[in-house]
């Protein structure tokens, strides 16, 4: 085996272990924020939505800067620094007793994420061959689901004692993740050339096809982020106990572990990437609309199952498509900018979703936020269809297995 192939194989295993750790620790804390501050402390959902939206916007919206800096200086220093900053954010969250302190803790967490997330994504593009990326992204997403369940179970168990214990555990584990990367992550460069920060950003902004694709995905993310805000609140409201939230993530894990990789393998040879993305989005949109009208957990979990199945169909195609469009001369910048749709859609989804949820309760129309999310999903579906029309998009980009 050549040294290059050996480095790629070792890199794959490192990425898988590192991804599992990061996802697990994230889900120890973040799914419980809405339960802690809305249900236990009585805050308005919009206040928590602002905090979650701020974290999302900072982490993803500034990703192009984090990626461009990583293009210049390498992945390792950015990843280690970002993880330590997220640990500081979790520690601050544990003592939050006013909205501004929760917002500040989410700001720190988001800033840490904008430092470590783009270089980690760029390492996947660097180390995984193009024909293997779709399957590798599926493996990462299966890990995401398993990590989400384990993290949510651990967080829910710790919440029985004290939310400060939840946050302290998250902070300590992120410090351990930083030490793991500092010790084992080689000093890899992300791009084929040492790209100046400004040049990497310029390359991305001049790529109109990529920019349009990323911004269109904002509507997709408005739906996707509700697994962190409105869905946990809905499950808690109907079940009457925050312990039921862990079953929501257990459903996601079961579906992902059993369906994600087989669906990706089967569909990659039969359907274009954009068809898989749009089909998943359509299923997610249809499953959102009736959620506000359900009256028991069985009905709610059935719709959540449908939502997760849509995500299982869409996510590998979305990630593979983003990676295939990245310029090898500025991988960090591209993967950083690819998060802008999540920044915009996530911020609007959290803040707007929280506001609509409060409004629906005030007007005794609980279906209001879910109907609006379904409409946004359909509009995004149509926008993607327009963008991916053959007159506008090169055929090579859309071929099965591309």
UniProtKB/Swiss-Prot annotation:
Disulfide bonds: none
GO molecular function: transmembrane transporter activity
Classification via PANTHER family: MULTIDRUG RESISTANCE PROTEIN MDTH (PTHR23517:SF2), RESISTANCE PROTEIN MDTM, PUTATIVE-RELATED-RELATED (PTHR23517)
GO cellular component terms attached to this protein's record: plasma membrane
Compartments (UniProt record): Cell inner membrane
Protein name listed in UniProt: Multidrug resistance protein MdtH
Source domain of life: Bacteria
Pfam families referenced in this protein's UniProt entry, alphabetically: MFS_1
InterPro entries associated with the record: MFS, MFS_dom, MFS_trans_sf, MFS_Transporters, Multidrug-R_MdtH
UniProtKB keywords: Cell inner membrane, Cell membrane, Membrane, Transmembrane, Transmembrane helix, Transport
Main localization, broad class: membrane
Keyword Secreted among record annotations: no
Segments on the Periplasmic face: 34-98, 160-164, 235-243, 298-299, 361-367
Membrane topology: Multi-pass membrane protein
Transmembrane segments: 13-33, 99-116, 139-159, 165-185, 214-234, 244-264, 277-297, 300-320, 340-360, 368-388
Organism: Salmonella choleraesuis (strain SC-B67)
Cytoplasmic side: 1-12, 117-138, 186-213, 265-276, 321-339, 389-402
Family: Belongs to the major facilitator superfamily. DHA1 family. MdtH (TC 2.A.1.2.21) subfamily.
